[in-house]
Curated annotation (Swiss-Prot):
Gene name per UniProt: metN
Protein name per the record: Methionine import ATP-binding protein MetN
The species this protein was found in: Rhodospirillum rubrum (strain ATCC 11170 / ATH 1.1.1 / DSM 467 / LMG 4362 / NCIMB 8255 / S1)
Lineage: Bacteria, Pseudomonadati, Pseudomonadota, Alphaproteobacteria, Rhodospirillales
UniProt key word Cell membrane: yes
Chain segments annotated as transmembrane: none
Top enzyme class: translocase
A matching Pfam family: ABC_tran
Annotated family: Belongs to the ABC transporter superfamily. Methionine importer (TC 3.A.1.24) family.
Keywords: Amino-acid transport, ATP-binding, Cell inner membrane, Cell membrane, Membrane, Nucleotide-binding, Translocase, Transport
InterPro entries named in the record: AAA+_ATPase, ABC_transporter-like_ATP-bd, ABC_transporter-like_CS, ACT-like_dom_sf, MetN_ABC, MetN_ABC_transporter-like, NIL_domain, P-loop_NTPase
SMART domains associated with the record: AAA, NIL
Amino acid sequence: MIVTEALTKAFSGPFGAIEVLRGIDLEIAKSEVFGVIGRSGAGKSTLVRCLNLLERPTGGRVWVGGRELTSFDERSLRQARRDIGMIFQHFNVLSSRTAADNIALPLELVGLPGPVIRRRVAELLDLVGLTDKGEAYPAELSGGQKQRVGIARALASKPSVLLCDEATSALDPETTKSILALLKDINRRLGLTIVLITHEMHVIKDIADRVAVLDHGRVVEQGRVFDVFTDPQHAVTRAFVHEVLNRDLPEVLVPRLATTRLEGGPVIWRITFTGPSANDPVVSEMVRRFGLSFNILYGHIDYIQGLPYGTLVVEAAGTESARHAALAYLSQKNLSVEVLGHVATPDPVTA
């Protein structure tokens, strides 16, 4: 559906050209939600504007729906852009027009007759949950409602692609959640391909099927959201994932760790559960099979694309051979185990 090949973009600056995009190669499938994440200045917004050629790339090629947009002249581009909707961080609704009239604007510009426009606007107001707000002006709408108007307006021409440039960044967490749910519903009902630009990893976790991580104009990692979250390869990706799935040992437990092994003393493990194995009773099974005793120190579970992902920090006590057998068992279950340290010897009591 959307393909970029060796895409580059440079802007002229006082000291020469500034490269913003450096050889971007992406393949975005029809009807998927594809996330692009990066810090400020990574090139995200420039990339999304190159997808519909609001910014013409310096080099490389862009295809949307099998058409090479980078080969089009301006007239052909205007026609092609009718198949590509776009929403922004700032809602860009006209204060002098009602919600319905804002949605109608792109249909008016292409000269559709009034009855057709009114029918389409009514459909879109219903789609975005604003049936009773058609006659309201932007000043009477909340931020989330304004963004819903923006989404409806972007869908007015029945595009097959929706580009979302930081569409939830100006919204509070609860409103963000509702807008993401709306986008996912639209994706499911209309088969719309959605490209979601954001700097917030929780947005990617909640809605995207696949994700590309952008850093200094390059794609440093991409793949299924579940795979990228559970096994990030690049330092930038790990930092993003850390914001959502904090795997650090809680501060209160740090004093309990010793770096040297204590003869016969308990060991602290961090067990990472992913996919179907996350539902298995592995701790009780290790107690039964190997005679180990466990003290659960910390645990957390989350769901990514409907699949469970969790971590459990435990204090494992038992013989060395029993612990080795338990580690082999966990490996057979495809669970990751990290030895965080050993239980520190308590400070001696002084009189």
